């Protein structure tokens, strides 16, 4: 048993099936690694392109007038506090870089203005807390007792 003389294949390497000049392998259907990767990517992108075109063809119909529309299904867009770029504080204009703090009102602030009492925050913390408590603890009412 000679371990050194035993090899996987004694056949000479075959050139790439696309003719790019590199050697192909039987595992990659006779293609080199670069050509194989390109064919796999093109095959993978073709179905996704068809799926995207199918998504764009769908038409959204408005709800009939007699049917009530659930307002909670589509949340309103968050109000902007004037922060057009995330790299500047909305209150003082200082460059915040990577340390910007995003408030619940949607603006980005520096370390000095990150708290709601330090900037003119339009977010209703009290109302949000009230809603969270109402959602977490629904009102439990007992059945009415019939009087005799």
Swiss-Prot record:
Gene3D superfamilies: 1.20.5.4770, AN1-like Zinc finger (4.10.1110.10). One of its GO terms (molecular function) is zinc ion binding. Induction: By dehydration and salt stress. Residues 64-86 are annotated as: Disordered. A zinc finger (A20-type) spans 10-44. A zinc finger (AN1-type) spans 83-129. Zn(2+) 2 binds at residues 89, 92, 110, 113. Zn(2+) 3 binds at residues 103, 105, 119, 121. PROSITE patterns: ZF_A20, ZF_AN1. It comes from the Eukaryota. Keywords: Metal-binding, Stress response, Zinc, Zinc-finger. Zn(2+) 1 binds at residues 16, 20, 32, 35. May be involved in environmental stress response. This is Zinc finger A20 and AN1 domain-containing stress-associated protein 2.
């Amino acid at each position: 048993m000679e371990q050194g003389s035993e090899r996987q294949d004694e056949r000479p390497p075959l050139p790439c099936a696309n003719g790019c000049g590199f050697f192909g392998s039987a595992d990659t259907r006779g293609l080199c690694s670069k050509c194989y990767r390109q064919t796999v990517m093109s095959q993978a992108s073709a179905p996704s392109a068809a799926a995207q075109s199918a998504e764009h063809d769908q038409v959204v119909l408005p709800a009939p007038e007699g049917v009530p529309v659930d307002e909670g299904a589509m949340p309103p867009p968050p109000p902007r506090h004037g922060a057009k770029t995330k790299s500047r504080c909305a209150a003082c204009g200082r460059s915040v870089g990577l340390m910007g703090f995003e408030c619940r009102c949607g603006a980005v602030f520096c370390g000095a203005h990150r708290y709601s009492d330090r900037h003119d925050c339009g977010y209703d913390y009290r109302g949000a807390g009230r809603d969270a408590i109402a959602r977490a603890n629904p009102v439990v009412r007992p059945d009415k007792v019939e009087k005799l």
